Each structure stands twice: as structure tokens, then as C-alpha cells.
């Protein structure tokens, strides 16, 4: 395949003719008056590109050993509840696995369960019970389960507050919680760092007026 096509050769030679030592060729005027109408240079189109074409076997092998996605109605309700109530995830939870037979000793016709602590899972199971047994839409069942959950949670907080006040009235002394102790330790560390930084900055300012000050002693 030639390096230049006819149109490109004409443009290149026209540029060369501007130089004083280049003479006009005999074919230049003819080609300039009758330029070619199509590309004479033959273009080679690749029939196969290994970088773009992927075999069907590779696509099958990627998805062959992947488990199928399993979706349950509980998953959507659970995700929705904890998205709306993120602080429920901060409550202490029992992570020990049970026997998986909650349906044998849990009656979800009501929210409060004697053998199961109140949590977001209670809202999920109560919503499913209302959908299956009361023929309620998902939105209505979820709203009713949330209202029952809020009512029981408020009762628990009131009971804890009353028990705390009664214990204090009888002489009980409550120490700081782990969270409060952690905050106190962090604040002490910040105060210590602030004092050291203030001393170092003050010594650095007085260095220019009193060269005898040793800055390294202020950081000890």
C-alpha cells in the first residue's frame, strides 16, 4: 500500500513547490485540474479482533459458579426500617444464633413478645403477619407496626426512667457509663495536647527575643 494517496500527494507537492529549488512536475497541473474522486489506497479491515471479541465460554464460566440471588419480603422491610431508624442499630443486640423456630413460640398477632426483645425484627415480623392475616396493604401494615413499636419503646423508656429514679431514692449510686468514660479520656488527651502546644508556641515566640530559651524542654 502506498504511503500517500493521490490527494495527499498533490497537497504535499504543492507545499514543496513553494520552495525556490523545487521545479513543477509535468503531472501536477493535470492532477490539480482533475483530482481523484475516491480513495485509491486500499484499506484493510480486520475481520477478527481478539481484544474486542469474547468467547461465549468465558461469559458462561463467570456466572456458572455464582449463587442465584435470593430475595425475601423481609429483606425489603428490614432495610427500610433501619434506613428510617439508624439509631436502632446502636442498641445492644444478642448475636447468638437461635434454633430458627421462632414461629413456634412467637405470636405476632401482637407486637410484644415475652421471649424476644423488642427490635426492628419485631416490626418486620409484625408487618408480615398483618399482610398475611389481615389482608392489609404493605404500607398500611408497616405504618401500624411502626406505631405499635413506638408505643412499646416509649413504655420501656418510661419504665427504665422510673426504675432509675426509684433506685436513686433508695440510695443507689450509678457510675459513669463506658461511653461517658471514653469521652472523658478523649477530653483529657485533648487538653494535654492543647497545653503542650500552647507551651511550645509561647516558647517559639520568645525565642526571637531570648535565644537562651530551649524549646525542646517545653515538649517534655
Swiss-Prot record:
One of its GO terms (cellular component) is mitochondrial small ribosomal subunit. It is found in: Mitochondrion. Its main location: mitochondrion. The keyword Ribosomal protein applies. One of its GO terms (biological process) is mitochondrial translation. Keywords: Mitochondrion, Ribonucleoprotein, Ribosomal protein. CDD domains: At1g26750 (cd23701). One of its GO terms (molecular function) is structural constituent of ribosome. Belongs to the mitochondrion-specific ribosomal protein mS23 family. Component of the mitochondrial small ribosomal subunit (mt-SSU). Mature yeast 74S mitochondrial ribosomes consist of a small (37S) and a large (54S) subunit. The 37S small subunit contains a 15S ribosomal RNA (15S mt-rRNA) and at least 32 different proteins. The 54S large subunit contains a 21S rRNA (21S mt-rRNA) and at least 45 different proteins. PANTHER family: 37S RIBOSOMAL PROTEIN S25, MITOCHONDRIAL, SMALL RIBOSOMAL SUBUNIT PROTEIN MS23. Component of the mitochondrial ribosome (mitoribosome), a dedicated translation machinery responsible for the synthesis of mitochondrial genome-encoded proteins, including at least some of the essential transmembrane subunits of the mitochondrial respiratory chain. The mitoribosomes are attached to the mitochondrial inner membrane and translation products are cotranslationally integrated into the membrane. This is Small ribosomal subunit protein mS23. It comes from Schizosaccharomyces pombe (strain 972 / ATCC 24843) (Fission yeast). The gene is rsm25.
Amino acid at each position: 500500500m502506498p504511503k500517500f494517496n493521490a490527494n495527499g500527494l498533490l497537497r504535499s507537492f504543492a507545499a514543496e513547490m513553494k520552495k525556490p529549488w523545487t521545479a513543477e512536475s509535468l503531472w501536477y497541473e493535470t492532477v490539480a485540474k482533475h483530482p481523484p474522486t475516491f480513495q485509491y489506497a486500499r484499506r484493510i479491515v480486520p475481520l477478527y479482533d481478539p481484544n474486542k471479541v469474547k468467547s461465549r465460554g468465558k461469559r458462561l464460566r463467570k456466572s456458572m459458579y455464582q449463587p442465584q440471588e435470593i430475595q425475601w419480603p423481609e429483606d425489603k422491610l428490614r432495610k427500610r426500617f433501619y434506613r428510617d431508624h439508624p439509631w436502632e442499630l446502636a442498641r445492644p443486640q444478642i448475636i447468638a444464633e437461635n434454633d430458627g423456630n421462632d414461629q413456634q413460640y412467637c405470636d405476632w398477632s401482637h407486637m410484644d413478645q415475652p421471649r424476644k426483645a423488642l427490635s426492628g425484627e419485631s416490626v418486620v415480623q409484625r408487618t408480615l403477619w398483618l399482610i398475611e392475616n389481615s389482608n392489609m396493604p404493605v404500607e398500611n401494615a408497616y405504618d401500624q407496626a411502626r406505631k405499635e413499636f413506638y408505643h412499646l419503646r416509649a413504655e420501656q423508656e418510661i419504665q427504665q426512667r422510673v426504675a432509675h429514679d426509684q433506685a436513686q431514692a433508695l440510695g443507689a449510686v450509678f457510675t459513669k457509663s463506658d461511653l461517658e468514660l471514653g469521652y472523658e479520656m478523649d477530653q483529657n488527651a485533648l487538653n494535654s495536647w492543647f497545653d503542650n502546644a500552647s507551651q511550645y508556641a509561647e516558647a517559639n515566640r520568645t525565642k526571637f527575643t531570648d535565644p537562651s530559651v530551649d524549646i525542646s524542654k517545653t515538649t517534655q
